[in-house]
Swiss-Prot record:
DNA-binding found in the keyword field: no
Binding positions (NAD(+)): T13, I14, G111, R169, Q300
Protein name as annotated: Glyceraldehyde-3-phosphate dehydrogenase 1
Pathway the protein acts in: Carbohydrate degradation; glycolysis; pyruvate from D-glyceraldehyde 3-phosphate: step 1/5
Keywords: Cytoplasm, Glycolysis, NAD, NADP, Oxidoreductase
Amino acid sequence: MAKAKIAVNGYGTIGKRVADAVKAQDDMEVVGISKRTPNYEAAVAHQLGYDIYAPAENVGAFEKAGMPAAGSVEEMIEKADLVVDCTPGGVGEKNKPLYEKAGVKAIWQGGESHPIAGFSFNAVSNYEGALGRDLVRVVSCNTTGLCRTITPIDRELGVKKVRAILARRATDPNDIKKGPINAIVLHPVKLPSHHGPDVRSVIPHINITSAALLVPTTLMHLHTVNMEVDTDCTAEDIKKIFSSQSRIRFIGQGITSTAEIMEVARDIKRPRNDMWENCIWPESITVDEKEFYFFQAIHQESIVVPENVDAIRAMMELESDGAKSIEKTNKALGM
């Protein structure tokens, strides 16, 4: 079977990780990545052997910088079966006509809204619904983290309601322009935050409300989650369900912070210190009748990366079984 030809439009925090993840698979390949300007990320992409494409008006700038562009973004799109759009939120919507004109499939990230594709994706929740689709949106890091925990609990115990409080990292580690650096910001003041409604774009029947704060850190998000279920359960029941999920990692051995989780990622030699899994403290799982609580940490730079790979596989119909795709992706990444 020929490999699916994938273009990555936007080579930033998510795009560079998606490109490497696609490259690691045996049923898909990267035909090119795009950058607007010949900055350090473009230089690294060039060193890694990726064909770089740029807006037509910027191709000359890449030539002058010593990293000749392989062509325009439009030319890259023409070579692809599917484009993974990893451009900043709002930019992806402007790119949609390019993909439609070229007749290629497209994936957007959670920075775009649900209507851009009409289908929001999470591998464990609705893989089969993405089979053969032309347009898909992979939900954000926080929504991905919530869906990964809600779905297996709902299947085993039935979820009556979810209440989630999200302490969101202020920005990514390489971002020197954003904050806060000495404040906690209500984000937003008016409740709910967008995360609850976004979960429902994937799992429509779930009753969920969310609240979010921005905190002065760049490492990870931290969720405090409360679920009420339909069935009596114990903390051990919840742990058993979570432990059955390959993209949930239990955190222990004295770890009480996101900093220590990132140190674990370094110590196990993850690329870019990535932690693709939800990180849950099993000691935090506390049951009160049919309600339970837990803490989980979400690595915003990487958690959606395997989801993008699975979305590609579903849309290109390379694998019809979601569980098999998840296993294949995980193995290729070394998860």
